[in-house]
């Protein structure tokens, strides 16, 4: 097994070298050119690319996400001196190394398949992006060497040299993110290519870009990279990759927990599963907003593509997406609630769980309610039309925006209850010193500046920017006023916290957050939809800022409130129910399904275009699959990925016992040190684990 591990870097390097040679334009292009399309043994070329690309992206998401929190965890271990954090970061990196060569293999297969099956399209793309291919290869080499050095130098760069190991981890993350940015430029260009604009009368070029008629690119490489969808896709994928990596780690820890045979191992893998779930949920919380930003840019570029996304052939895929997102939030909350059983004193807060559960279920029901239903003519007559007279309103974006904010707030409150479970008497803020007051004030200042900036933006917004008449400016006032009210509520919370009434301040700020973001701006969104529809996107931004301000500011207060608080008892790591571990495993199944579905939506929105609106796909498979066909393909991808991950992790674990060294989770009792006049009466070896 050690020999196999040593060969991994060389296998990955070989695949990249071969792929780079494959990226060179084929010689046949110089003599008549290659055919537009080819097939592998008669297989559907689009299906081949779909499956290979999605499997590559899933592994790549894990490879990008894991180094981020591995570095953070290692840094925490370095600063605190706790052995368990360093071991956790090392275990994260072992999982990364096990997946890296598989990612490279699928990447090489994808490159071969694209150039073999779609030579004309890839030739067109290469005319624009050839320099990025070289940079991609160089960065991949750099990432591979850095990753294996980061793994194998763990013990060598320990102690006084630890800072150099941390710098290596930072470099690894920089290379990984840079690779993602380059790859995102290719796929985002296919959806939103910057088009050249020419004055029809004078022939003067107004804007450089892609010529629709000649397919000639007249812009710069940076213009092609920085296309309208590039930044939203970068944000969405980066956050998604972190969430994905966290849930994968959580599932891995759950399997290890279920097979652990010692108390130390069960405690360690229980803690590892908690960290993985925490990372997944923390990244999952901003995901809906990142997705909304991306969808907004799709609409801005092409109303046709945007309407098709939410109201056309792809509308029902978003109902499936809603089900999966809701299931992830409910599963993550269930795990947190189950975890309270291992926290002494948490029974004080169990009475609140049922109310959070009610909020989550009701919001989930609204979140997945469709606007229109696939009805027969007879059913439409019975119901009085295509839309349900009442439930149709729950299918609109105004309702969706409100409930997703409520789901996020409820999830955040679950974590606050979990965090507060074993805390007893608190140290008054007035007795904590200057640093605590700085934390509270700094949190408030950051929140106030962001909310104040957007409130000013809404107060001064010109309706013409949204293609609205001047009289529509009246609809801009309410959200701006609510943003100011949120700032004032923050000031009240600060004053109460400094007066040792921080819990009351938190409750007030949570109540105002729910009131403004959900109960006022939610229904107000329906008015905006009918009277000033383009402004609905600004309503969504205001809701998001209010919700995120609540999360950030309440966390700042909570850190101060619990600083130095008495503990009712230590968390009993390892004393966790088995069903909670199955929840972690189901979470990873759900997130793999969600990422596969969203990959299909993003790519499928182009329909029969290789490059939307410019280069049409004229192959036999240039069609939008049915929902049933899409579901079968995604189910196959999910099953294949989970099987591959299980196999890769099993292979990487050969030769390892899976047990945890004593002292990792539970400190060893130190033997008493006798003075010069004392003798040791305790027999040797009497010290053991707590």
PLM regions with names:
Residues 21-51, 687-690:
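Short, strongly hydrophobic alpha-helical membrane anchors
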Residues 19, 64-69, 100-121, 134-163, ...:
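Transmembrane-helix bundle segments that line or gate the permeation/cavity pathway
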């Amino acid at each position: 097994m050690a020999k196999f591990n040593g060969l991994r870097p060389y296998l990955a390097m070989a695949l990249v070298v071969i792929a780079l040679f494959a990226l060179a334009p084929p010689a046949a292009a110089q003599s008549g050119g290659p055919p537009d399309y080819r097939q592998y043994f008669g297989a559907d070329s689009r299906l081949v690319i779909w499956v290979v690309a999605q499997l590559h992206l899933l592994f790549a998401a894990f490879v990008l996400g894991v180094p981020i929190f591995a570095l953070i965890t290692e840094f925490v271990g370095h600063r605190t001196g706790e052995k368990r954090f360093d071991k956790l970061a090392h275990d994260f990196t072992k999982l990364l190394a096990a997946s890296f060569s598989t990612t490279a293999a699928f990447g090489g297969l994808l490159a071969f398949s694209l150039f073999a099956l779609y030579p004309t399209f890839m030739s067109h793309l290469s005319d624009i992006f050839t320099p990025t291919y070289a940079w991609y290869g160089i960065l991949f080499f750099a990432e591979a060497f850095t990753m294996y050095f980061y793994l194998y130098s763990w013990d060598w760069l320990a102690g006084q040299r630890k800072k150099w190991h941390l710098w290596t981890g930072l470099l690894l993350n920089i290379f990984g993110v840079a690779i993602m940015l380059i790859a995102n430029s290719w796929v985002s260009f296919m959806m939103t290519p910057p088009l050249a604009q020419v004055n029809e009368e004078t022939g003067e070029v107004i804007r450089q870009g892609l010529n629709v008629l000649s397919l000639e690119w007249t812009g710069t490489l940076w213009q092609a990279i920085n296309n309208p969808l590039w930044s939203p896709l970068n944000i969405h994928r980066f956050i998604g990759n972190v969430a994905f990596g966290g849930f994968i780690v959580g599932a891995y820890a759950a399997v290890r927990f279920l097979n652990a045979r010692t108390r130390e191992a069960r405690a360690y893998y229980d803690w590892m599963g908690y960290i993985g779930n925490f990372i997944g949920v923390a990244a999952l919380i901003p995901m809906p907003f990142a997705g909304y930003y991306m969808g907004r840019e799709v609409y801005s570029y092409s109303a046709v593509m945007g309407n098709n996304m939410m109201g056309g052939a792809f509308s029902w895929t978003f109902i499936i997406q809603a089900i999966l997102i809701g299931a992830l939030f409910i599963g993550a909350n269930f795990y947190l609630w189950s975890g309270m059983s291992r926290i002494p004193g948490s029974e004080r807060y169990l009475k609140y769980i049922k109310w959070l559960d009610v909020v989550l279920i009701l919001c989930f029901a609204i979140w997945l309610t469709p606007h229109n239903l696939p009805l027969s003519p007879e059913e439409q007559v019975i119901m009085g039309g295509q839309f349900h007279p009442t439930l149709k309103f729950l299918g609109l974006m105004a309702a969706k925006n409100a409930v997703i904010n409520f789901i996020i707030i409820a999830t955040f409150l679950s974590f606050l209850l979990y965090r507060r479970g074993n805390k007893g008497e608190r140290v008054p803020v007035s007795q904590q010193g200057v640093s605590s007051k700085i934390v509270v004030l700094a949190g408030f200042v950051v929140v106030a500046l962001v909310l104040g900036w957007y409130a000013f933006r809404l107060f001064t917004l010109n309706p013409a920017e949204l293609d609205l008449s001047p009289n529509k400016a009246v609809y801009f006032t309410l959200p701006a006023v609510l943003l100011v009210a949120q700032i004032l509520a923050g000031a009240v919370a600060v004053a109460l916290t400094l007066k040792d009434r921080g819990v009351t301040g938190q409750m007030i700020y949570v109540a105002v957050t729910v009131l403004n973001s959900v109960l006022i701006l939610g229904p107000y969104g329906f008015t905006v939809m009918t009277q000033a529809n383009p402004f609905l996107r600004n309503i969504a931004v205001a809701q998001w800022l209010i919700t995120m301000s609540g999360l950030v500011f309440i966390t700042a207060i909570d850190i101060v409130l619990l600083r130095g608080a008495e503990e009712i008892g230590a968390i009993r790591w390892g004393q966790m129910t088995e069903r909670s571990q199955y929840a972690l495993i189901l979470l990873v199944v759900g997130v793999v399904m969600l990422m596969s579905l969203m990959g299909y939506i993003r790519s499928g929105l182009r329909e029969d275009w290789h490059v939307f609106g410019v280069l049409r796909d004229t192959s036999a498979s240039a069609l939008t699959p049915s929902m049933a066909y899409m579901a079968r393909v995604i189910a196959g991808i999910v099953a294949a990925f989970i099987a591959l991950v299980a196999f890769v992790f099993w292979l990487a674990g050969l030769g390892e016992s899976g047990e945890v060294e004593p002292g990792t989770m539970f400190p060893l009792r130190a033997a008493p040190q006798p003075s010069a006049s004392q003798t040791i009466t305790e027999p040797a070896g009497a010290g053991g684990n707590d």
